[in-house]
A protein has these predicted regions:
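Large intracellular
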Residues: 1-159
Length: 159
């Protein structure tokens, strides 16, 4: 499931932004694995921010435009049960129609790829490995190592 043939290179200055977007999608993935894909429906769009619904569910990591402009329509398609190939096509069109470059473009690509992975039920660890690979060797290795500690901690807490 590779949406994009080429990826922009991530710069060191993109670290926090890319990590925040990756954290956002890992939180969505974790939520959908426990509650099902329709759990995404409780998230509403308000002031360019995806936020929790009135049920008081935990907040997601913060994302802002242009990510919300691309991610929200894709999330709606997934919730509405649109075929994954159609979601992929629309993701490609949304990204092709923008003028973002560098780290911002990479964050959009990372998010679109992640949402398609969430739609098919990919595990959090595989999703993390996918996003880390997209970030490049330096940032990707750092993110993967950070998340491996989180995953290991979760597993220890479940035992």
């Amino acid at each position: 499931m590779n949406l994009f043939d080429t990826l922009p290179r991530a710069a060191e200055s993109d670290r926090e932004h890319l990590f925040a977007v990756a954290d956002f999608f890992l939180a969505l993935s974790d939520m959908t694995r426990h509650e099902g894909i329709f759990a995404l429906d409780r998230y509403c769009y308000d002031k360019n921010d995806l936020k929790t619904g009135p049920d008081g569910a935990p907040s997601l990591p913060q994302i802002t435009p242009p990510e919300t402009d691309v991610f929200y329509p894709l999330i709606r398609l997934v919730v509405d049960g649109v075929e994954s190939e159609t979601v992929r096509d629309i993701a490609r069109y949304l990204l092709a129609s923008g003028d973002e470059a560098g780290g911002t473009r990479l964050s959009l690509m990372l998010g679109a790829e992640s949402l398609c992975a969430i739609q098919i039920g990919e595990s959090d660890r595989i999703l993390c490995a996918r996003m880390s690979a997209m970030m490049g060797r330096t940032l990707g290795t750092e993110y993967q190592e950070r998340m491996d500690k989180v995953f290991d901690s979760r597993e220890r807490n479940r035992q």
